[in-house]
Amino acid sequence: MATSYGFFSPSVPSSLNNKISPSLGINGSGFCSHLGISKRVFCSSIEASEKHAAAGVSSSESRVSRLVNRGCKLVGCGSAVPKLQISNDDLSKFVETSDEWIATRTGIRQRHVLSGKDSLVDLAAEAARNALQMANVNPDDIDLILMCTSTPEDLFGSAPQVQRALGCSRTPLSYDITAACSGFMLGLVSAACHVRGGGFKNVLVIGADALSRFVDWTDRGTCILFGDAAGAVVVQACDSEEDGMFAFDLHSDGGGGRHLNASLLNDETDAAIGNNGAVTGFPPKRPSYSCINMNGKEVFRFAVRCVPQSIEAALQKAGLTSSNIDWLLLHQANQRIIDAVATRLEVPSERVLSNLANYGNTSAASIPLALDEAVRSGKVKPGNIIATSGFGAGLTWGSSIIRWG
């Protein structure tokens, strides 16, 4: 498995070959290197293979050549949303707001919300089936499932339940990734590392969240923003010449977590009793979390400052500029953020993907949801280069330069 040093990107579109030097190296920050294959590749499985090669194992038997020459590409996408739609006019019936007020400040017109009978696992499984169908991959051929969510329906994770719903008979490894609105981006990078360093062939990456369950529906500052959805992509191993994952850039800043969170609630009564010398805290009480708390102004400043920097860093590692990309695909948080980032990157509006108006902020689902809609509508075509970025609570943010198909 690839370590925290990241993955490499051996190839680029043929149309860009004159502008970019293909690379296979890995540098310490986890990005592409244009210096060729480094003398040491930071994958334990590869290092072990090098020892075997030194001992006389033939190159055809060596795992080094298989992994170093291995790329990965996105071959299928899918999405699913709940049937229940909540419009801005619906919200205006129980909070002091209006369609004009919400749309002007966020770009959102409606959102989809899970009802009491709905399951996030079912929604994720539906999105996954759609992605597998497009990729022409059978559930039994899945090697790994990554469920990117901050709202699992089981404390220990929902990925195994998605695996069960899909009927994967080979019991592939399935686990959750929790990184809020950046979750899908981390899942995509993790999938690439698993393919390149771990020998996996078909990895299913799902972004699914039901933030409606953690929203204070009396707070017009947050309840207007969020919707529920699921999106998925199939990441598949390929030859290095077909590689579609060029570079990535990932960050987190715990100091900014106070601006966007849903924290564990403390019992102030117990704390007061403890100050009087009594034994408290046992047996532990059932935990509960606050609703989503957000300082909108600070989150906006964070996004418009850090996201362009992250995308530019990823582009630089890939040997590209913003003029080389076909599409800019950001986490669908707020249209003002999307527009501001596009302006800073000098990407024209006609090359920006946005479906925020119809779904709201769907957290980890937003990027694959928008991608699926753009692919199925014919807007995004095979071979298109996409600069994509997720950002949110933590604070976490990250970008990746990918090729579709």
UniProtKB/Swiss-Prot annotation:
Primary localisation category: plastid
Keywords tagged on the record: Chloroplast, Fatty acid biosynthesis, Fatty acid metabolism, Lipid biosynthesis, Lipid metabolism, Plastid, Transferase, Transit peptide
Protein localization: Plastid, Chloroplast
Family annotation (Gene3D superfamilies): 3.40.47.10
Name of the protein in question: Beta-ketoacyl-[acyl-carrier-protein] synthase III, chloroplastic
Highest classification ranks of the organism: Eukaryota, Viridiplantae, Streptophyta, Embryophyta, Tracheophyta
Keyword Lipid biosynthesis: yes
Species, as recorded: Spinacia oleracea (Spinach)
Tissue: Expressed in both leaf and root.
Primary role: Catalyzes the condensation reaction of fatty acid synthesis by the addition to an acyl acceptor of two carbons from malonyl-ACP. KAS III catalyzes the first condensation reaction which initiates fatty acid synthesis and may therefore play a role in governing the total rate of fatty acid production. Possesses both acetoacetyl-ACP synthase and acetyl transacylase activities.
Signal peptide start and end residues: none
Active site: 181, 331, 361
Domain of life: Eukaryota
Record carries keyword Disulfide bond: no
Catalytic activity: malonyl-[ACP] + acetyl-CoA + H(+) = 3-oxobutanoyl-[ACP] + CO2 + CoA
A Pfam cross-reference name: ACP_syn_III_C
